[in-house]
UniProtKB/Swiss-Prot annotation:
GO annotation, cellular component aspect: cytosolic large ribosomal subunit
Record SUPFAM superfamilies: Zn-binding ribosomal proteins (SSF57829)
Keywords, alphabetical: Ribonucleoprotein, Ribosomal protein
GO MF annotations, alphabetized: structural constituent of ribosome
PROSITE patterns in UniProt: RIBOSOMAL_L33
Taxonomic source organism: Chromohalobacter salexigens (strain ATCC BAA-138 / DSM 3043 / CIP 106854 / NCIMB 13768 / 1H11)
Pfam families: Ribosomal_L33
UniProt key word Ribonucleoprotein: yes
Name of protein: Large ribosomal subunit protein bL33
InterPro entries (UniProt xref): Ribosomal_bL33, Ribosomal_bL33_CS, Ribosomal_bL33_sf, Ribosomal_zn-bd
Length: 51
């Protein structure tokens, strides 16, 4: 089953992306570099739960 997750910027800007992932195939927390438009740079985004 694919669960919805939130990818939060590690730059501390509060910007986030929403996506989904298959928890059976990727049980670990996701980390990926994505563009943060607030600081206009590519920064690490980490997985967080959607409340």
């Amino acid at each position: 089953m694919r669960d919805k997750i939130k990818m939060v910027s590690s730059a501390g800007t509060g910007h986030f992306y929403t996506t989904d992932k298959n928890k059976r195939n990727t049980p670990d927390k996701l980390e990926m570099k994505k563009f943060d438009p607030v600081v206009r740079k590519h920064v690490m985004y980490k997985e967080a739960k959607i409340k």
